[in-house]
Amino acid sequence: MKIAIVGTGYVGLVTGTCFAEIGVDVTCVDTNSEKIEALKKGIIPIYENGLEEMVIRNTKAGRLKFTTSLESCLDDVEVVFSAVGTPPDEDGSADLSYVLAVARTIGQNMKKYKLVVTKSTVPVGTACKVRNAIQEELDKRGAKIEFDVASNPEFLKEGNAVNDFMSPDRVVIGVESERAEKLMTKLYKPFMLNNFRVIFMDIPSAEMTKYAANSMLATRISFMNDIANLCELVGADVNMVRSGIGSDTRIGRKFVCPGIGYGGSCFPKDVKALIKTAELSGYKMRVLHAVEEVNEKQKSILFEKLQKHFNNDLEGKTIAIWGLAFKPETDDMREAPALVLIDELLKAGCKVRAYDPAAMNECRRRIGESIYYATDMYDAALDADALMLVTEWKEFRLPSWAVIKKTMEQPLVLDGRNIYDKKEMEEQGFIYHCIGK
């Protein structure tokens, strides 16, 4: 089976490479010629465990190809996946210009039946717009060619995307014809044979499922952060509360960890887009408005704790930051809490020394040389008046606290992810603040 994946960003590259891994003949398309040339050499533009090796292996095997021209491969493929970006507009709605541009290109160049599958996260109704865009181009040509549209939203976690694709919780597919369902069944047959759950539904429901899933997870995070903040006020320990409620099978243990807010390429964008979708339908998503409000406030919680400790006198203080990416195992800093924190620290007159195992170049690209980029976590802590744990990378879990204490100007640790034990930290002579206790 031959398919094309348009867009070699996070979703497109992982999707195309993983399909190639199970034997599908894949052509990945991107208009960025520099990126395509790099991919042909096995150089990938994102940090994702196991992906680079898989790209190299499947490129050598001839199952994975890269091109800047969708037109050049369109005749050869049965299915075209659209995995281009859908960045938020100023009003929070999803910008579908790239998605519709792909649809128009297909309509301008297709010569026989195609199944056009939207992989990008898009609002309900996008498939109709894609169908109309393709049909308009066919009408301009006077061409009568059958085609189908479908929705196949991704549920990949950055840092674990390859495993998520190869061993999915579920695969959601929205179709509107028997022909489209048969093609998607053929494509996902290896997953069905391994007893992974493939769920077929109508297209609007598939489009809504992605937004609903991410918004539900964002809601859990904001709820636990709200509970954590209340725990501090009433003398409860949020870690104990988390253990208590997580043991309830109706709730579970996932996404009930308090912290300094969610970030990344999905949750912030998708919550905003779902709120906007509701507004356009004359409905207000009251819960999601609160979710956003809590999250924005939570990103400043460590800074507020720091201010309180130093009685609002932060001018000239040196602050160490461990972790810049929005989560471990990625270099993604989109909507990262670290960006908010760094901005607040610099405005308060602080000097910032930061270290992240993967996101240093990305941070430098975003904010330039306004902070010191440390060589390791110990270098970041040098002469620091406070150390802030922002991203819970594994290498931060068991540092040599004796070395850290000697290195720092003041033994103050603010743990934004609750990965350290308060009693142990205090026994080692640190002043320790965390979230929710």
Specify the residue positions occupied by each region the protein language model found.
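Structural/interface elements that position substrates and couple domains in central-metabolism enzymes
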Residues: M1-K437
